[in-house]
Amino acid sequence: PAGSTPDNVYKEQAGFEALVNSAYAFWGGQFYGREDFVLLLNGGGDLWINIANCGYGRQMSKYEELTASVGQIKNTWNRLYEIINDCNAGLERIDQVEFKDKKLRDIRFGELSFMRAYAYWHLVEIYGNVDLRTKETSAESLSMNCYRSSYEDLYDLMLTDAQNAVDNLPVDPYPVKDVGRATSKAAYGLLARIALTRVSYCDSQADKDKYYKIAEDAAQYVIDNQSALKVSLYNTPAEVFDPDNNKTNKEAMFVVTHSTESSLNMQAKNPNRMHMYFHASYSARAGMVQDYEYGNDKNAKSGSMAMMPTRYLLELYNENIDARYNAWFREEYKLNTPKAYAWTKDQLDYFEKPSSMIGQVIQPGETALLFTKKKIADKRNLPYAVVDIDDTYAADGSVSKSANFNIHFPTLLKYEDANFENKGLPTNSQVGANDVITMRLPEMYFIVAECEIMKSGGNKEIAKARINDIRRRAAVPGKEAEMEVGVDKMTIDFILEERAREYCGEFMRWFDLKRTGKLVEYVKAHNPDIPLIQPHHAWRPIPQMFLDSILNPDEFGQNEGYN
């Protein structure tokens, strides 16, 4: 209304609620569900590479031409600071709000504290020691001098905020239908994650041990209080990412929500596109057509926004005993047309099969395509098309230069979306509605294990027990004993292997490699298609737009390697 000011609007409970809700909006509207974070956080590491090793988003995923002027670098910076600014505005005003329900004040205080810590964790890990802002800012106030803050000060604020979230957030969201709100389990998880990351900025072992204790205590609390916190592991890997469990996922500790009602999303016709970003090309091959079961492979071509697993990632799994691989990756496509398919010369040539197979028939429901991590003998003479690991990748792990084979690979299934079929939308629709799980319970087990491995006087038997808790859940039925590992495996490198098997594609890998100081080592060892990797890539550049807007850009400075 005319004459309204933020102070007047936010003093009313309805206005304040709108401010709190706005702090959530960008997580789905800009980050978790969109391509930038896929490129920034799944890309740039050892587990994923652009489909066909193409150049889409190469600045983020392969560090090619990564400069301070790249749009995604600017947008990520701006949106994270906007979230922080909303949180600062709310935290500054919360005690002036006329709440009808007094307990709501503490809950919203916890949510704003959680959101600010979560945003700063992303911001600091992506860009380094940036400007610490705890007061609401305007464009005018930022057109002045800005100064870098120390990692100590930045992490002190994050840890304080995370602890405030722990102290104030309820077990259930408030109101209970708002499943995307931060709750107690999310607060403990964030405290554990932030404290573990804080270790990487410590000089002495004694200082590291201080933060290992905070991280382990928070993670172990979640493990010990699953019933009270309303979180638990599914019995099998297949259940974790079953689309039927997406909106009520019992293993999720924090989710970024996307509504099945398009108009409720920040970008109504463009909400969650994750279902498009990990598919291999299958339609129009060997008689296959695009359908709901196998998903939208529109992006599965060179030059598009899609990611394929590295050879290293695929070879981390022993699918004979580890059920995660077949639960979370698709290799086989069965003919999905009502009529049989007869092989044609052009399709035989495409898959390098003998012309003598012209006219041979694949019946509906029979295997038409197999894109596999295995090596298949006599693969060209099988009645269906085979692209095996040696077709898709070279021996050194790089992506094949064959345009016929480098768009065919095992497809990640963690983001399959039932919204299209449920709504009767076309199979090539982009409008996904899945929630994106950004924190899952197994992370707490890995944090406890890592702390016991790395802290002074740690107990590797405890680490082994926590890792085996997750590996037993991951086992093929009857293979639980074979999946268990011994104390000799309790190293940081094994933790990173196990995190890769459990969390591939879930936006964690770049953070994990950076936190452990392994980014350059692992990329050089396992992803030869990122030859430009350098130590300074553990930070992205400070946006030129920001430096141009302040009075002391030289004093603030660009991150090393980007001048």
Please report, for each region that a protein language model flagged, where it lies by residue:
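C-terminal substrate/ligand-recognition segments
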Residues: 331-470
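Conserved, well-structured interaction surfaces
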Residues: 12-13, 17-30, 52-127, 143-157, ...
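Long, intrinsically disordered, low-complexity segments
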Residues: 67, 80-83, 157-159, 240-311, ...
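Short coil/turn linking the two alpha-helices of tandem helical-hairpin repeats
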Residues: 122-131, 173, 194-206, 454-457
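Alpha-helical solenoid repeat scaffolds, predominantly canonical TPR units
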Residues: 86, 154, 161, 211-214, ...
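An aromatic- and glycine-enriched ligand-binding surface/loop that stacks and positions planar moieties
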Residues: 1-53, 163, 185-188, 193-382
